[in-house]
């Protein structure tokens, strides 16, 4: 599904309440941004979140001011969330979220979030590290497992899993994900 929007088109999307002098355009799917000025005052681009068993990382967030706009419409790609784990949890990881992109000549790319680590049922003492992404995924496992790294300027690292089968929380735009708790089943904060 695609759609076009206009900077002077008012509010498109859910629950935006700008002041009378501000114009907000929200994209929840791919489309084109049709400009009415040569510079956008503020652009926020967020990548899709990572899938999880341990905490999936949030998509990276970019905020820029006074970004130059071309004379034509600007393509917008909205990153999807990552694919979840297979139902049997035997071997396959979840996937990272997809990147979101504003523009093509001088694109702003927000990196998708890292997947959360997991414990395969066939080997409960194994561990899987969280994936790197816009914000890193939390580690998963009954042995300590590393967190995924966040992208500098976009998000924070995930939290590490502990040796008590507690998975780490996914990283976010504001802080690192928490390490897994010291009791099985209690994961870290995301």
PLM features: what roles do these ranges have?
Residues 173-175, 182-183:
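Intrinsically disordered, low-complexity Arg/Gly-biased segments of eukaryotic RNA-associated proteins
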Residues 1-26, 154, 158-172:
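Glycine-rich, low-complexity segments
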Residues 82-147:
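Acidic, low-complexity glycine/serine/threonine-rich segments
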Residues 26-34, 45-103, 118-120, 180, ...:
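Glycine-rich strand-loop-strand elements at beta-sheet edges
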Residues 17-23, 36-39, 56, 70, ...:
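A short, polar/charged loop/turn motif at coil->beta-strand junctions and beta-hairpin connectors
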Residues 12-46:
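GGW-centered surface loops in extracellular recognition modules
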Residues 124-174, 188-190:
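Glycine-rich (often Gly-Gly/Gly-Pro-rich) flexible segments and glycine-rich loop motifs
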